[in-house]
Structure formats: structure tokens, C-alpha cells
Regions:
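Metalloprotease/metallohydrolase-associated module, dominated by Zn2+-dependent proteases
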Residues: 5-82, 99-145
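Active-site recognition of the HExxH zinc-binding catalytic motif
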Residues: 86-98
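Intrinsic-disorder-driven secretion/translocation and chaperone-binding regions of pathogen effectors
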Residues: 1-3
């Protein structure tokens, strides 16, 4: 009986990894910003959330209760507009994957969302290294490590 459970766990793990690889290859489409909302299509699902700009110690976060994402107000300035948009894409996708597929936020959803954030930033003509520095210094300005 123990061997059977082990084989099932291994098979489930392999299927999960294959699904993650599939999601990593799947593009984000039709990204639109309208007022304080973002909408996009990912993996055949139309997703939308309200964007709230406030003091956010984790740079960006998503609500577990409402259709909202939170982006630190320092990132929403005009000189950081591309980073702001890329972070919005990241949060919407991370929220969707965690809620819809039950992925672990830090180990699975975050990896996929970061890849989609990077792809979208490249599409906007942004620089990934500059974006990472903006996020890094914003995160550390609140004493996070």
C-alpha cells in the first residue's frame, strides 16, 4: 500500500510539473488598462482586477477576498510606468493560478507570474534589470530582506 501511494504522489508531481511547463509557454494576451482596472487573457481565461495604489511593503500583493491587486505607490509614478504595468500583470496571474488551480503561491504561481511579468515588460520595451532594481530597492526601503 505504501508503494502505491508513493507512485501516485510521484505521478501527480510529474503531472503538476508538466502543467507548469505548459503554463510557462502560454502567452498573456489582450492586456488592457482602463482607469484603475487591468484586464487580460491567460490560458483561455479573461481575468480582471481593480488596481489599488498604496503603501505596500511587499511591493505588490493581491487580495484574498476581493478582485483587487495592490501596488506600492512609489512604483506608480510616471517614470516607472512600465514596471507598474508589469507588476500588475504579475499579480493578476499569480492570483489566478493560486485561486483557480490551487498552486502554491511562492513555489509555483510566483514562478509562472514572474515569467509572464518579464515577457510583458519586454513587450513594453522595458528593461528587466532596471525593473528588478526598482522592485529590489522598493522592497528594501520598507526593511524587508
Amino acid at each position: 500500500m505504501v508503494k502505491f501511494k508513493h507512485k501516485t504522489d510521484k505521478r501527480d508531481s510529474n503531472l503538476r510539473q508538466a502543467f507548469i511547463k505548459l503554463l510557462l509557454k502560454h502567452p498573456v494576451r489582450d492586456v488592457k488598462f482602463s482607469g484603475r482596472k487591468i484586464s487580460l487573457t491567460f490560458f483561455g481565461h479573461r481575468l480582471s482586477d481593480k488596481i489599488v495604489s498604496l503603501r505596500e511593503p511587499h511591493v505588490a500583493e493581491w487580495s484574498r477576498r476581493r478582485k483587487e491587486i495592490f501596488i506600492d505607490k512609489k512604483i506608480s509614478t510616471n517614470d516607472r510606468r512600465k514596471s507598474f504595468k508589469a507588476l500588475c500583470v504579475h499579480e493578476v496571474i499569480e492570483k489566478f493560478l493560486t485561486e483557480h488551480f490551487g498552486f502554491r503561491t511562492d513555489k509555483e504561481s510566483h514562478i509562472i507570474a514572474t515569467q509572464k511579468e518579464k515577457e510583458y515588460l519586454k513587450y513594453l520595451g522595458g528593461n528587466w534589470e532596471s525593473h528588478e532594481l526598482i522592485v529590489y530597492w522598493d522592497w528594501h526601503s520598507y526593511g524587508e530582506h
